[in-house]
Amino acid sequence: MEQSVNLSRRSLLRGRSPTTPPPIRPPGALAEPEFAGKCTTCDECVTTCPEGIIFRGSGGYPEVDFRQGECTFCMRCVDVCADGALSETKRPLWRLELRVLDRCLARRQVVCQTCADVCEAEAIRFVPQLGSVATPQIDDDTCTGCGACIAACPENALEAIAHG
């Protein structure tokens, strides 16, 4: 039986497999195909971001790196986007899924709650475990996707996955 793999030309040229999640774009980014069609890679959003979390990524398109800091939702990136690739009216501003990786200190039986301490939305809570260290749980409905927890984690044990 013959199997075929469906790779878009862009994904193939960028070395991404169909299972690789899309990069995290600045808040208010249109859906990926429309974003790529409108973004002129002018770098205005990169240079205007006061937190320094937007960088020139693959193909010159802007991406967000939460390891550099959190998004304060100041929307300056949207304000300077003349080509319409970022829109303040898009809701939600982005759809991110946060994952706690195995290298999390709490998962390795070391008491650490840094991520919860910096989460203004209180989307991270630590669930007590009988005879064990409390482990983090993320409430996706409460999480704003600001990335403060990612920047603060001493083990880089949180990752954000973009969805659409």
Q: Which residue ranges define each predicted feature?
A:
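Non-ligating segments of multi-cofactor redox enzymes
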Residues: 1-164
